[in-house]
Amino acid sequence: MRKIILLLFISSMSHSLSAQPTEILQGAWVREEKEKKTVILITDQLISVAAYNEKEKKFLYTWGGSYVLHEGQLQLQYEWSSNDSNLVNTSASIPFFIKGNKLSLGENLTELERGPAVPSGDLQGVWIISGTYTDGGLNKRPNPFLPRRTMKLIVGDYFQWVSYNVVTKKFFDAGGGRQTHAKGVYSEEIGYFTKATASVGKKMTFTYAIDGDDWRHSGQKSTGGQLDECWTRRRYIELQFKPGSN
């Protein structure tokens, strides 16, 4: 009887340890150097890495995609890479290590500190732009997931959006920085923006509303003019548009 209980305990511990890294990895991880800031955003589904020089308003690179964890490795399926489009639609196994409050991912991304804990907000997660609002109502795109994809991650108090084509492997643009959201007000402090470096450092405030899996994002663009966008949770978009998901 004792042997059975011991085996059940060991089995339970092994299961919890194998599941633990996924939860530990999720969040925003940051490393600040003299002229470079590296931010890794990790959800249960996606990882995004971005590096930039906020002082000089220079974007350095971004890459990322979907992932799973297996035997101490982060198995990445690249969806975008600003520096090397040949990586797109390929996979890589990247070792990771967490010690205390710091993450090391592979050989080059070391000693990133976990971002501060923030209240869980209703915008946290991964979103795909799916349409725009006009006087006539909501106009949804025929297929917001393929081949071109514009995605936004909100993790902790950081955000990143990235636009890319998963068929041609072309990277278009990206932007990111710090964010807060609560009670229908969403604010961004822009840390990098490939389209318009003049926007870096700006603090923007928008209104937002959640309707099911849709997020209505309204306000003024950092480059001027109004926006009234619909973003939809990626999981829902995948169920609708990802080949083989139905």
Residue locations for each model-derived region?
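Beta-propeller blade signature
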Residues: 177-181
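Glycine/small-residue-rich hydrophobic helix-like segments
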Residues: 182-186
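Lipid interaction determinants
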Residues: 15-174, 187-246
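Sec-dependent N-terminal signal peptides
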Residues: 4-13
